[in-house]
Amino acid sequence: LRCLVGSEMCIRDSNMAMQPFKMMVGDMVNEKQKGLAYSIQSFLCNAGSLAGYLFPFIFAAIGISNIAPKGVIPDSVIYSFYIGALILILCVIYTSVKVKEFPPEEYAAYHGITHESKKEKTNMFKLLVKAPKAFWTVGLVQFFCWAAFMFMWTYTNGTVALNVFDTPVITTMTNGVSRVVLDTQSAQYQTAGDWVGILFAVQAIGSVIWATIIPMIQNRKFAYVLSLVLGGIGFISIFFIHNQYALFASFILIGCAWAAMLALPFTILTNALTGGHMGTYLGLFNGTICVPQIVAASLGGIVLKMFTSPGSVAPEVNMLVLAGVFLIIGAGCVSIIKER
């Protein structure tokens, strides 16, 4: 329970720290440069992710314990969280001090906000009704993308443990029903967990590299489609790979999709917004990140059970294939986005 509460607080607080800066890009950067600005944000986010994945290995290498009793978090992970919190606080303070927002009058002139529109009373429901079409079409793409990555975060560990490290299985009894599951106490499972951390670091490297390439592609929708298709290929390829090092290629491709997801939706949406309420719209747009993850987390177990034959271990790799299919569907949905 404490782990769940802690995870929820980390996710919530990181969103609270990051979203205002996404809004500032929309407020302060002109339309021609927004794509580059959001790509720079994507680059920096993924560089931070890479550092976060590497910190536990660095601490273990310098002698800080990465082993702990059951139910206890290793010191290497604890210190990584401390360092991450310190970096977050320092970066937020630095950005808040150094970045000067537009004065209200200049902001209104820059965004074409009239005195009458500022007096207009509205609420979130009215804003949703008046939302530009891009809000909904990009949101549809977001649904498939974030559901796919929720599957990745949930099922990669089991997939790598079974398909790559040949983790042994055991039979358990739950409410009188026997189930065949992976032996999570085995050395193979622990090794797989460590390797997944490395794979996520490789994904971050792929994202960092691809974030520098996205601004070079003139057609934004083509860049979006290409990124998601590459990510979909990466997910589907995991089904055929049984070598731990070959998985690097899969996760580099997945990183391409991740880089685009952090940059292009916000570029397209903020270019479609005019006048005021940009901050409110971006806050509402955050729902296109949360809702698909909730749906994927709620229904993923049911779908996985449909893939599982009686007396056999759940084929979690099928969920990653489904994630790849979702990204390719999302790429297809990009075609209905109409940019302003």
What are these regions (language model features)?
Residues M16-V29, A260-T274:
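Intracellular juxtamembrane helix-capping segments at the cytosolic ends
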Residues E31-Q41, L273-F285:
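Loop-to-transmembrane helix entry/capping segments in MFS-fold secondary transporters
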Residues I209-K221, L304:
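Helix-to-loop junctions at the C-terminal end of transmembrane segments
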Residues L1-G6, I11:
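Single conserved hydrophobic/aromatic residue that forms the stacking wall/gate
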Residues G276-F307:
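A late C-terminal transmembrane helix in Major Facilitator Superfamily
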Residues D75, D166-A204, P315-V321:
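Loop-to-transmembrane helix entry
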Residues S7, M16-A17, F21-K22, M28-F151, ...:
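Intracellular loop-helix junctions on the cytosolic face of multi-pass helical membrane proteins
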Residues S7, L230-H242:
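C-terminal ends and interior cores of transmembrane alpha-helices
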